[in-house]
């Protein structure tokens, strides 16, 4: 049985017409699923009982089972722990801004990259999410909170470009006007840097935003923070980003988690400005999550100094305003606690 959320618009039309239903029925089904958040064919009352029975024979509509939810008392940021059909768990986060609601979603169960400051990597890698499981995070959050998500960041558990096909297909579904209907420039992919996939992304014709999780200005330091750097060097990654920018014309966000005594030195700021010179970038400076054992945040003074050095060297930069600090909103924390409690 196929999960309807795995299907593109064109695939759904083909599937239902092959079953003998009219093409326009696809739009009716999608209205129920994406607009009304209905995942039961029996509730689709503008379809005949015969059609509903036929659809139930061939398709499921797999929303996610909510295991846990944490809501920030500070800013309303909401973190969800979901159970998948095979018993694995993933996390998603809903962030509230005055003018929009942003969802941070996962692409893998666990993560193979194992950045030292990330809780997701501590629990290991299990598998890629299906297209439907990625899409279902948006629908399940919207159904749970009864709110419409306007922005999506692929910054949750996992490395999106290591689950490339399912990530790209989910973006097309979320962007399609008869499905997720989320503007393409309101969707961001965050990656630690998979050079060939960054170049491939430039060829997709998808005008999504790209964020690169860099975290260090030299290979020596990045090897320690992001083990995958031993496979793909900073030079290879930035070269791929330059190709991406030539093809798309888009500015790229550079994510930089600052850790006291590791990558927050004045020399690091100067080196970062040097390697990013003449690139169309914006640097997001992120104090390390204090819940990660053994890692400490830089002082406020050091954060401001780091930012000032970048600005003085012509690199746009900002210190990210944190959300959900009281609920450890960074993805991976809830899942890791659940795994530890069962071991």
Swiss-Prot record:
The active site is at 91 (proton acceptor), 331 (s-methylcysteine intermediate). Residues 97-326 form the Radical SAM core domain. The keyword Glycoprotein does not apply. One of its GO terms (cellular component) is cytoplasm. [4Fe-4S] cluster binds at residues 111, 115, 118. CDD domains: Radical_SAM. It catalyses: adenosine(2503) in 23S rRNA + 2 reduced [2Fe-2S]-[ferredoxin] + 2 S-adenosyl-L-methionine = 2-methyladenosine(2503) in 23S rRNA + 5'-deoxyadenosine + L-methionine + 2 oxidized [2Fe-2S]-[ferredoxin] + S-adenosyl-L-homocysteine; adenosine(37) in tRNA + 2 reduced [2Fe-2S]-[ferredoxin] + 2 S-adenosyl-L-methionine = 2-methyladenosine(37) in tRNA + 5'-deoxyadenosine + L-methionine + 2 oxidized [2Fe-2S]-[ferredoxin] + S-adenosyl-L-homocysteine. Binds 1 [4Fe-4S] cluster. The cluster is coordinated with 3 cysteines and an exchangeable S-adenosyl-L-methionine. Belongs to the radical SAM superfamily. RlmN family. This is Probable dual-specificity RNA methyltransferase RlmN.
């Amino acid at each position: 049985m196929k999960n309807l959320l795995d299907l593109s618009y064109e695939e759904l039309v083909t599937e239902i017409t092959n079953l003998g239903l009219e093409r326009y029925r696809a739009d009716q089904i999608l209205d129920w699923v994406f607009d009304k958040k209905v995942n039961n064919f029996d509730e689709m009352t503008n379809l005949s009982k015969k059609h509903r029975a036929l659809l139930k024979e061939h398709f499921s509509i797999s929303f996610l089972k909510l295991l846990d939810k944490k809501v920030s008392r500070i800013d309303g940021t909401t973190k969800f722990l979901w159970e998948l059909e095979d018993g694995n768990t993933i996390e998603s986060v809903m962030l509230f801004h005055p003018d929009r609601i942003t969802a941070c979603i996962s692409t893998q169960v666990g993560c193979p990259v194992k950045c030292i400051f990330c809780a997701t990597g501590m629990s290991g890698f299990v598998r890629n999410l299906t297209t439907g499981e990625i899409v279902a995070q948006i629908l399940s959050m919207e159904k749970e909170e009864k709110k419409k998500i306007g922005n999506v960041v692929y910054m949750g558990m996992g490395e999106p470009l290591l689950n490339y096909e399912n990530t790209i297909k989910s973006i097309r579904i979320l962007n399609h006007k008869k499905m997720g209907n989320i503007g393409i420039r309101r969707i961001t992919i965050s990656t630690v840097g998979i050079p060939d996939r960054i170049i491939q992304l430039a060829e997709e014709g998808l005008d999504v935003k790209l964020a690169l999780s860099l975290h260090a200005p030299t290979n020596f330091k990045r090897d320690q923070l992001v083990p995958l750097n031993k496979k793909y060097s900073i030079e290879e990654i930035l070269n791929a980003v330059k190709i991406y920018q030539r093809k798309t014309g888009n500015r790229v966000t550079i994510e930089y988690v600052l850790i006291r005594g590791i990558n927050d030195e004045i020399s690091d700021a100067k080196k970062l400005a040097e390697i990013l010179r003449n690139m169309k970038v914006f640097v997001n400076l992120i104090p390390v999550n204090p819940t990660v054992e053994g890692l400490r945040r830089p002082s406020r003074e050091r954060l401001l100094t780091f930012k000032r050095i970048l600005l003085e060297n012509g690199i746009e930069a900002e210190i990210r305003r944190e959300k959900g600090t009281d609920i450890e909103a960074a993805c991976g924390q809830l899942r890791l606690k659940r795994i530890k409690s069962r071991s």
